[in-house]
């Protein structure tokens, strides 16, 4: 596991970056977990989302890009140093670091709507790779509290990964009174 941050012009492992964003303690912030993300722009957008909401972003390898990717940087704009981004070698490593109480696996095959959940600080929101979503074995992981979906029109495949994470995090944050935010 390593935590990332910008050092000069290069994104690289560093110490835990509490940033200047809306941060709580490690146990009371929402956590976004991207399992093997493939598209750098989506992760860049999620970095920006984490900075804006005070959430943490956790990435599980293998990643479909490197942190020098221009698309990742461009999507994150100047928010990279305001976010906590941690890269984990494996999903087991992520669980060990996160010690999650509740994990919500977002998948189009779930029957429960994300809007039917009462979210609590510390919850983990897990999303799969853009091309295939969360594999069945990851959805069935013992850490997963519930599988949830974002409703869509019939016949549509899925939402964009970063958009899905935004919907989830903002709903959880809204339910918790936008704690720490400026309204």
Name each model-derived stretch.
Residues 1-183:
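Post-transcriptional modification and biogenesis factors for structured RNAs
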């Amino acid at each position: 596991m390593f935590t990332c941050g910008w050092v000069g012009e290069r994104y690289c492992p560093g110490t835990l970056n509490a940033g200047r964003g809306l941060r709580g303690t490690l146990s009371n912030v929402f956590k976004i977990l991207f399992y093997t993300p493939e598209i750098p722009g989506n992760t860049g957008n999620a970095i920006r989302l984490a900075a804006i909401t005070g959430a943490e972003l956790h990435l599980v390898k293998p990643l479909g890009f490197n942190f020098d990717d221009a698309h990742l940087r461009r999507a994150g704009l100047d928010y990279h140093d305001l976010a906590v981004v941690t890269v984990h070698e494996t999903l087991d490593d992520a669980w060990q670091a996160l010690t999650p109480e509740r994990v919500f696996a977002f998948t189009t095959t779930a029957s429960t709507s994300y809007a039917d959940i009462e979210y609590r600080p510390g919850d983990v929101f897990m999303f799969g790779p853009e091309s295939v979503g969360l594999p069945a074995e990851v959805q069935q992981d013992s850490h997963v509290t519930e599988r949830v979906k974002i409703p869509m029109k019939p016949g549509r495949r899925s939402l964009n990964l970063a958009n899905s994470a935004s919907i989830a995090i903002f709903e959880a944050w809204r339910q918790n009174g936008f704690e720490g935010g400026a309204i």
